[in-house]
């Protein structure tokens, strides 16, 4: 009646650019072959899937026959981003470390599905289900400010430039 599947994926998505335009400013500089993590690099992915089924003929209430519960948990390591210092007033930034050398936080999601199959005749039936995505209502961090690594603070007010602006208000 119960099935548990678990898998782990380790991948290294390294390259010279995450999309077709990543290196367009460097086309006149010869063949540069520096590899770095691509924007969509997810080093670690862990999937757990639990499935429980009630079958006909078991000692269960009739309404549970051909019903089931499926729970899926997914955890993924954070994607890379390029960390930089707080932007200067005249524009530009200063990269800290390498391109895509910093990582966003891990994400974690649990999804659930309850279903019931109603059989009409041999080979014909209807599967009714209720699916809940993000069962725990977790707010995963998908993007961060490159100067702070925070999803909510861009770092401007804490910078010297930001403090000067506050004093001159």
Label for each model-derived stretch:
Residues 21, 25, 29, 89, ...:
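Amphipathic, alpha-helical segments enriched in basic
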Residues 28-34, 92-100, 167-168:
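Extracytoplasmic loops and strand-loop junctions of Gram-negative outer membrane beta-barrel proteins
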Residues 1-80:
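Gram-negative outer-membrane beta-barrel transporters
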Residues 38-43, 100-107, 163:
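Short sequence motifs at beta-strands and strand-loop junctions characteristic
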Residues 59-92, 105-109, 115-169:
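C-terminal beta-signal and adjacent terminal beta-strands/loops
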């Amino acid at each position: 009646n119960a099935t548990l599947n678990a898998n782990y994926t380790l991948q290294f998505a390294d390259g010279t650019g995450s999309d077709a335009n990543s290196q367009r400013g460097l086309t006149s500089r010869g063949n540069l072959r520096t590899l770095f993590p691509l924007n969509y690099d997810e080093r670690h992915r862990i999937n757990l899937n639990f499935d429980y089924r009630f079958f006909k003929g078991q000692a269960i209430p009739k309404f549970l026959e051909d019903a089931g519960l499926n729970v899926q948990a997914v955890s993924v390591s954070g994607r890379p981003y390029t960390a930089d210092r707080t932007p200067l007033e005249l524009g530009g930034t200063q990269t800290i470390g390498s391109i895509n050398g910093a990582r966003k936080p891990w994400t974690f999601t649990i999804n659930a599905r309850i279903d019931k199959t109603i059989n009409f005749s041999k080979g014909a039936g209807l599967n009714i289900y209720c699916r809940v995505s993000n069962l725990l209502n977790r707010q995963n961090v998908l993007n961060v400010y490159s100067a702070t690594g925070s999803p909510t603070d861009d770092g401007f007010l804490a910078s010297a430039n930001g403090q000067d602006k506050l004093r001159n208000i």
